[in-house]
Swiss-Prot record:
Record-given protein name: Zinc finger protein 511
Signal peptide: none
Organism of provenance: Mus musculus
Domain of life from the UniProt record: Eukaryota
Gene: Znf511
Sequence ranges of Low complexity compositional bias: 186-198
Role played: May be involved in transcriptional regulation.
A single MF term (Gene Ontology): DNA binding
């Protein structure tokens, strides 16, 4: 094996050993020290180049399918009753209690104890049934809000609102949002306030939830099916 003369000098310890070794370039390469021409390389689908990616994809899909097939287990606890006064629902899972509380007690009117499925419907109910200025303003401007929270439309009467919701939002024709509450027992401030309002036709009213019934003496076990 032939070594460059400068390397012999460095190995022998001669005076010129500290000088850097000369770099000799191939004259055929021109000014660039090397030649490189990019080109596309195509591998078949079953080539070993894709093996690692195929393994990772398989593990990812397997993990996703496992998560979808697994049904989350409910946190089972000893049976307990609803903590709201007058409610005798019995629960065996915390998820059932949370669903019940959200639907029945989460948006409850403080005047008449009616429960609504959303805060928007509760606000509309309080405005229309427990605001003494509502009927006065309704004679001058459109005050009946659309029950769809994302819809800004207002109407002159509740019947106009009902027609709008049936026609545009595809609500059922027999859909009812509210109706006069039947007085039971001593008169409440809300009942007295409702008595001072102008009488309205029951056919114009719409109802989402029925009037809360008196709690039965027996226990009722609550359950719901998760979607």
């Amino acid at each position: 094996m032939l070594l460059p003369p400068a390397l012999y000098s460095r190995l022998a310890g001669e005076p010129g050993a500290a000088e850097p070794l000369p770099v000799e370039r191939n004259p055929a390469a021109g000014e660039a020290p090397f030649r490189f021409a990019p080109r596309a390389v195509r591998f078949p689908r079953d080539h070993e180049f894709f093996e690692d990616g195929d393994v990772q994809r398989h593990l990812y899909l397997q993990d996703m399918l496992t998560q979808v097939s697994e049904t989350p287990e409910k946190s089972m606890v000893p049976e307990f009753t609803c903590q709201v006064a007058g409610c005798c629902q019995v629960f065996a899972a915390i998820e059932d209690y949370q669903h019940h509380y959200h639907m029945m007690h989460g948006n409850t009117c403080s005047f008449c104890n009616r429960a609504f499925p959303s805060g928007h419907l509760l606000d509309v109910h309080i405005l229309e049934w427990h605001d003494s200025l509502f009927q006065i303003l309704a004679q001058r401007q459109d005050m009946y809000q659309c029950l769809v929270e994302s819809c800004p439309e207002k109407f002159k009467t509740s019947q106009d609102r009902k027609d709008h919701m049936v026609r545009l939002h595809l609500y059922p024709a027999d859909f009812r949002f509210d109706k006069p509450k039947t007085n039971r027992g001593p008169a409440m401030p809300a009942a007295a306030d409702a008595a001072t309002r102008a009488p309205t036709d029951d056919s114009d009213a719409m109802e989402i939830c029925s009037e809360p019934a008196a709690p039965p003496p027996c226990r009722r076990t609550y359950s719901h099916r998760s979607v």
